[in-house]
Amino acid sequence: MAEPALLDPTAAFDLRLYPAHLFDHELPLAGGGGGDDDDDLPLDGLEFDLPGDFSVEDFLLRSPERDDSGEGSAAGSGPTASPSSSPTTSASNSAVANGSGGEVKHEESDEGRSGGGDPKWSLKRKQASPGPSSDAAKCRRSGDGDVSPSASASRTAVDSDEGGTVCEEEEDERRAARLMRNRESAQLSRQRKKRYVEELEEKVKSMHSVINDLNSRISFVVAENATLRQQLSGGSVNCPPPGVYPPAPIPGMHFPWMPGYAMRPPGSHVPLVPIPRLKPQQPVPSSKVVKKPESKKTVENKSKSKTKTKKVASVSLLGLLLIMLVFGAFIPGFNHNFGMCGQSDNAMFRNFGQSHARVLSVSSQDKSSLNNSDMIGVDVGKMTGNTDGPGKKHQPAHNSSEILPALLYVPRNGKHVKINGNLIIHSVLASEKAVAHKASKDDSDQSARDHKETSVAIARYLSLPGKDVNRQETSSADGPLPQWFREGMEGPILNSGMCSEVFQFDISTASSNPGGIIPASPVVNSSSVNATEKIPAHSAAYHGKLKNRRVMYNEAIPLTGKTANNTEPFNRTSESSSKLPDSKPASSVVVSVLADPREAGNGDGDPRVSPKPLSKIFVVVLVDGVRYVTYSCTLPFKSSSPHLVN
């Protein structure tokens, strides 16, 4: 440890021992104690030649070489020291060289060397390293004892030139060593940083591998969880029922379907411990638990059976509806719409508007008998005759042809309407009978053909003679009325009387030969003598009234050209008809029923279904196999209640 040096503030200041840049140029420098101008040092001869890399730290660590002699020790202790010795002592003690890392502390002491009480300054050196270099030792004092300021100052003045050169070389070497140390430390720091970065990269790689491993484990566990859930939901027998085994295994325990290394940390050698399978403690709950999958199966089977039953029921219902539709359209049942009890319906046909419609024969009347009452009706299984006539009695017509009820379905009011063709035939037959009576009255066939506007008689039972009719065998007048138009068993009902003749034409006489169209055998013996005896007289008022065509009349509409008592035309007709031979019976056959194309549509769709209701139909009738007559029949409008003809 360097000894502290005392600095006399009253001593003269020597600028040669201190760098000039530390002091202001305008600072006045006083002499020893007198302060005279003579004591001032000349500064003109001094030259301050400093290097470019000069530093204060290097300057503080550098000091001139001092002598270790003990001269002037006593003189330096006194207060009367020479002015030249004070700055020398301060300069020698101001800086102590101790390597490159030392620190310098300035301490102010209140103690005085003499009893004068003047302040004393000292520089204390604190060394960082105990081993000084050999070159630095040359710049320090060689002695260990106290050196007086005057002696050190004199010694420094002698060897100042040699010490300056040695210190410069020493400073250069020290600077080079410091640079080398700095470079080595920088290199070591870079290497440490590089190693640290490499370690961090290795850690990042290891973390990435751990993350990938954990992701693979998570995916494996998720897949196994999904498989177990599927087995539990499907009621698999392989999975144990809940409640029998422990609720959950220990986290360290491995599953049997997973590999051993998948759940163990790397480097461990723990053997795999199998899952213990315990026997059920409670047999009763276990039996109940075992039955759960069976109950699930039964529930699933029941649900499947229910769905199958519903499907079968729906399919069977559709099939039944289809069968009903087929049978209802092509295989009709017995006709009970007209209240016919004794009638034998051996064959029934429906006309759907085809061009090749069936021809139905209608029994004609035998005109040879004059005393039999004529009855136009639907029931042809029985005949009503005059019991007063010789050889006449009520008997069924075994040789007569059976009337086949032609059931016609016409679209009207959004649905199909059933029309009985036999009643149309009887209506046309009544019209033809009136025309025949008119023709026999005029004795001219040409006049009968030219008479186009004839009324249509209502097809119903005519009045029978009260004295000649056996009322027990005839049908009651209050019985069901013949109807040829009905909409679904309800709605408006139309009887005959709404038909009018449109035109007629004859065919060749060859068609009337036995090889042609065969007329039906007579069914009812025609007689008009007593047919109209009980027609009310007030029916003639029909000519004076104009009624709505929708209104049905409760009496027969009288034909055109009748007399006041309404019996002359029938009497004349019966007389003339009695002269006709029996070999040519009269017959009428419905050939076809047509609809107005303007109302039925364009015919692109189904001919049986039309969205428009029909108001008129055309009926083509073959009369006696030689003449075709076309009638226009008006259909009634739909109403809430049926209209009946009384």
Swiss-Prot record:
Residues 172-232 form the bZIP domain. Residues 562-585 have a biased composition (Polar residues). Residues 159-172 have a biased composition (Acidic residues). Residues 43-53, 71-98, 279-288 have a biased composition (Low complexity). Residues 1-311 are cytoplasmic. Residues 59-69, 103-113, 291-303 have a biased composition (Basic and acidic residues). The chain crosses the membrane at residues 312-332. PROSITE patterns: BZIP (PS50217). One of its GO terms (cellular component) is endoplasmic reticulum membrane. It is a single-pass membrane protein. One of its GO terms (biological process) is response to endoplasmic reticulum stress. Keywords: DNA-binding, Endoplasmic reticulum, Glycoprotein, Membrane, Nucleus, Transcription, Transcription regulation, Transmembrane, Transmembrane helix, Unfolded protein response. Transcription factor involved in endoplasmic reticulum (ER) stress response. Acts as a ER stress sensor and activates the transcription factor BZIP50 and the chaperone BIP1. This is bZIP transcription factor 39. The gene is BZIP39.
